[in-house]
Amino acid sequence: MNHILSDRINNLATSQTLAMAALARELKAQGKDIISLSLGEPDFNTPDFIKAAAKKAIDDNYSTYSPVDGYQDLKEAICRKFKRDNGLDYKPSQIVVSTGAKQSLYNIAQVMLNDGDEVILPAPYWVSYFEIVKLSGGVPVEVPTSVETDFKITPEQLEAAITPKTKMMWFSSPCNPSGSVYSREELTALAKVLEKHPNIYVVADEIYEHINFSGTFCSIGSIPGMLEKTITVNGVAKAFAMTGYRIGYIGAPEFIAKACTKIQGQVTSGANSVAQRATITAVDADPSVLNEMVQAFHGRRDLVVGLLKEIPGVKINVPEGAFYVFPDVSSFFGKTLKGHEIKDANDVSMYLLAEANVATVTGDAFGNPNCIRFSYATSNDILTEALRRIKEALTA
């Protein structure tokens, strides 16, 4: 019945992370002992002080529509957060609160892109960037990076990718899926390229900023001359273990913020009222409240990287943030493992599911055909068992 559906939906790829997670759940329901490392979701509970704020909001009868762009006091709190944590000076009129950072990104693409506008995507990138750009009429321009360069785009690569049709560059730091974190020096070098192209805007996805093991974090918008051409995207899902609250937000030039409010008013209107009230408490909190969770992720990172380095043929960078590893498995291409012909990263991912009962995600979904991604947002015991299975399968 695809001929009845729109070309738009027929040309839209299914989210590979969600698809693999669904397949893992299906196999588990069949009684298989599946370890799913496919989804990026903290395995911690929302902090009690945030849950208390949500309960209070219910008792205070926050049960009606909010303003389309979010409650004024929440936008003021987000401005304080941007100033405190990122050195970014925004006014409440430059803030738009949405139903998750994914909607924030979709709003941006819809209001910024005309048909044929090019968007530079340093690869690997988060799975939805590519499809969101396509859905909005834009043309994704992938710039490949590799494990040898810590999966970071260089100024030379950025300059070479720019054409008269370039409208934007989208990137995340810390990066999903590679965990790479750009330093101030690296971002300054990219900014020097962009300052020669005043009509190119940057989307800086900083959803993982607090899950950062490097000791420092820099927002590209804090570099002189960049705030006016940067749209900073963030949210509370990852750092505060609030994935189900569905709150994301942007700080942007005011004309872009107004445009995002305009389109959101025709799609979802304001985000969940109770979740917004809880978010005020989250963004006003000192980041030190997250130390225990961040330290746990740091320890898991070290465990997983150490175990992966024991597997012959696997190459890996050391992720400095987020909660993913993105190993290069290209040395297995062209081999046959336990009767499975391995041609690409997707074959590796499916082989590990079939033979190791471990769900990962192919790097193709993130714009890198040589890698697979898995999340270490689970316990050390589960990670140790998963890596034991992976090692056994890949050394067969």
Q: Where are the regions a protein language model picked out?
A:
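A glycine-/small-polar-enriched, mobile loop at the entrance of the PLP active site in fold-type I
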Residues: 38-41, 56-74
